[in-house]
Regions:
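Acidic, amphipathic alpha-helical patches
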Residues: 301, 438, 458
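Short hydrophobic core segments
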Residues: 409, 464-468
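A conserved short coil-to-beta-strand element within the FAD-binding core of flavoproteins
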Residues: 451-463
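Beta1-alpha1 glycine-rich phosphate/pyrophosphate-binding loop at the start
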Residues: 385-452
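Flavin-dependent oxidoreductase catalytic cores
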Residues: 1-386, 390-406, 414, 461
Length: 468
């Protein structure tokens, strides 16, 4: 098998993961306002577990509603959230996957003012990200102690729900990162100054969780902020050494922060495996497992694992685009893997821009697995699809998958419509891959395509069709 090395088991602490594929943590913005996750989210994660992923890291679950700031992610404050969490855990375990609960104490300076107009909290009175004229409120030592208590409480909730591991969100210039980084941490007490002091907030979180539950702890951290005055890769090495000594069982590493948000949601422009460069240096400094994210492909994943610079490779949006990616690779059917086009339109864009739940430009079933499930038709119809653009191709694919007889009429000599035109630049190769994927799928489904045929309003083919 081409990707054998990706299908070997590996341990994080006492947790054995069946392969090297990790679903990167991404919010879905689909939970209920009370902090309980929704059934759509359960179906979403189960589909990825069924698709062969070894470890799923859920999008961040907040300590309390104030930190969540209205975003519809889970909140680990009260025990009434446990039943729904147990359901998602058991749904993923059913398919042999492990599942990790990511816990967050919020975005700090990246947050908006609260409902009373008060500035967000941060490590120091650093400027707010969205309004530099507004200075953040530094956390007091009492505030910090409360956060440690809340982390322990949230960890217990995660443990009771059955999670296999816990990840601390120390990434992207969020609150934990604001303590770790001198560009934002100007404190003069025991939480500021030296690297050891700046790491105290993070290591106390690790200790709070470790004292509360016996689960592996993963720490998510960007090793290279990629902006002037931000933390560099070299400067981060001392920090990950401190994290290992504090008891962290694995590191989830990449690059970027809100000042370089193109790396937080890596675009097509950045190319493949755009953050794997952090792994080689990190490997020299720690002996715990390393996982890495950032526009990976099966080929880049294989290179990274075979180099031993990382132990797990993380895929985020690719698993949104095709939940069965892993199983298709394992069965040597890479041609059936639907590619993520790295557009950020219907995943990140829907959540950030429209405040609605996650979907996908190439997979409308994402977060709608049950409602949009493809089921065998009760009566076979003759269906005509006019135009072989992306909408026509998907309509034809779904209709044929349901069992209908489908024919496409396209006025040019090629499929893809504007996708094929847009795919001209080298960095848009993912669009070419999507067009090729449609070609393969339609061929396997015996969809007939008539090229150079412009359908007229009175065309006989329309009269003969059961559905257009």
């Amino acid at each position: 098998m081409k990707y054998d090395a990706l299908f070997t088991p590996f341990k994080i602490g006492n947790m054995e993961v069946k392969n090297r594929f990790v679903m990167a943590p991404m919010g879905t913005n689909s939970s209920h306002i009370d902090g309980c996750i929704a059934n759509d989210e359960i179906d979403y994660f189960e589909a990825r577990a069924k698709g062969g992923v070894g470890l799923i890291i859920m999008g961040c679950q907040f300590l309390n509603p104030d930190l969540a700031q209205g975003s519809l992610e889970g909140i680990l404050q009260n025990s009434y959230v446990i039943p729904q969490l147990t359901t998602v855990v058991e749904a993923t375990h059913r398919w042999g996957a492990k599942i990790c609960c990511q816990i967050s104490c919020g975005t700090g300076r990246n947050a908006f003012p609260n409902m009373y107009g008060e500035p967000p909290f941060s490590s120091s009175d650093t400027p707010s990200t969205f309004n530099p004229e507004m200075k953040c409120r530094p956390l007091s030592e009492e505030d910090i102690k409360k956060i440690m208590t809340e982390f322990a409480n949230s960890a217990i909730i995660a443990k009771n729900a059955g999670f296999d591991a816990i990840e601390i969100h120390g990434h992207a210039g969020y609150l934990v990162d604001q303590f770790m980084s001198p560009v934002w941490n100007k404190r003069t007490d025991e939480y500021g100054g030296s690297a050891e002091n700046r790491m105290r907030f993070a290591t106390e979180i690790v200790q709070s969780i470790k004292q509360a539950v016996d689960l592996p702890v993963i720490f998510r951290i960007a090793l290279d902020h990629l902006f002037v005055e931000g933390r560099t890769l070299d400067e981060s090495m001392e920090l990950i050494e401190i994290l290992e000594k504090a008891g962290v069982d694995a590191l989830d590493i990449d690059a970027g922060c809100y000042e370089r948000i193109d790396y937080i949601f890596p675009t097509a422009y950045l190319g493949d495996a755009c953050m794997d460069y952090v792994c080689k240096e990190a490997r020299k400094h720690v002996n715990i497992p390393i996982m890495n994210a950032g526009n990976h492909t099966p080929e880049s994943a294989l290179r990274l694992i075979e180099s031993k610079d990382a132990d797990f490779v993380m895929f985020g949006r690719q698993f949104i685009a095709d939940p069965d990616t892993v199983n298709k690779l394992m069965s040597d059917h890479e041609e059936d893997v639907r590619p993520c086009i790295r557009c950020n339109e219907e995943c990140v864009g829907r959540i950030v821009g429209r405040l609605t739940k996650l979907s996908c430009a190439v997979n409308p079933q994402a977060c709608e697995e049950e409602r949009f499930a493809i089921k065998p038709c009760s009566q076979v119809k003759n269906i005509v699809v006019i135009g072989a653009g992306p909408a026509g191709l998907e309509a034809a694919r779904v209709a044929a998958a349901e069992g209908h007889n489908v024919e496409i009429y396209e006025k040019t000599n090629m499929i893809g419509g504007q996708l094929s035109v847009a795919a001209t630049p080298k960095f848009k190769d993912q669009l070419k891959k999507l067009v090729k994927w449609f070609e393969v799928q339609l061929n396997k489904l015996d969809v007939i395509i008539h090229f150079n045929y412009e359908v007229k309003a009175d065309d006989q083919i329309l009269k003969n069709a059961d559905q257009i």
